Design a protein with these regions (language model features):
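Active-site nucleophile and cofactor-binding loops and adjacent substrate-binding regions
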Residues: 72-80
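Structural motif
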Residues: 41, 73, 103-105
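Flexible, glycine-rich active-site loops centered on histidine and acidic residues
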Residues: 2-18, 79-128
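A generic, residue-level signal for flexible/boundary positions that often mark functional hotspots
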Residues: 64, 69, 73, 107-110, ...
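N-terminal beta1-alpha1-beta2 module of alpha/beta enzyme domains
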Residues: 1-65, 69
């Protein structure tokens, strides 16, 4: 059995520098406690703000760790070009020495789809 943690990315009322330090500390603590992975979600129009690039943030969080894996929980696939996702995943997998878990989904935040110009009603079709 393996265990992972979903890290909080919503920054409502929190200084972003402080949130970054907390995420780094939580990742280090998770690794020290024996957790297998940490996960980040993807929200672009979250109330109060959010950290919006889970793969980029995950790459930074893995620096300074040796064993723990990073995963997306989940990346809203219809909002991204599949080649870009594949390339970013390939690079992240390489620099992390194979410690990446890709979680994909159709997404659900209507405001995110509006911001990206992707019709919310077509998200399942775009995902396939």
């Amino acid at each position: 059995m393996q265990f992972g943690l979903i890290l909080p990315i919503q920054a409502q009322g929190v200084d972003l520098d402080r949130l970054w330090q907390e995420l780094r500390a939580e990742t280090a603590a998770a690794e020290a406690a024996g957790f297998d992975a940490v996960f980040l979600t993807e929200f672009h129009q979250a109330r109060g703000g959010a950290l919006v690039s889970p793969m980029l943030l995950g790459a930074a969080l893995l620096q300074g760790t040796d064993r723990i894996r990073f995963g997306t929980a989940v990346l809203a696939a219809p909002l991204h070009h599949p080649v870009r996702v594949a390339e970013d995943l390939l690079m992240l997998d390489w620099i992390s020495r194979g410690r990446v878990i890709l979680g994909l989904g159709i997404g659900h935040q209507r405001q995110d789809f509006a911001a990206f110009g992707v019709p919310h009603a077509e998200r399942a079709e775009v995902f396939e």
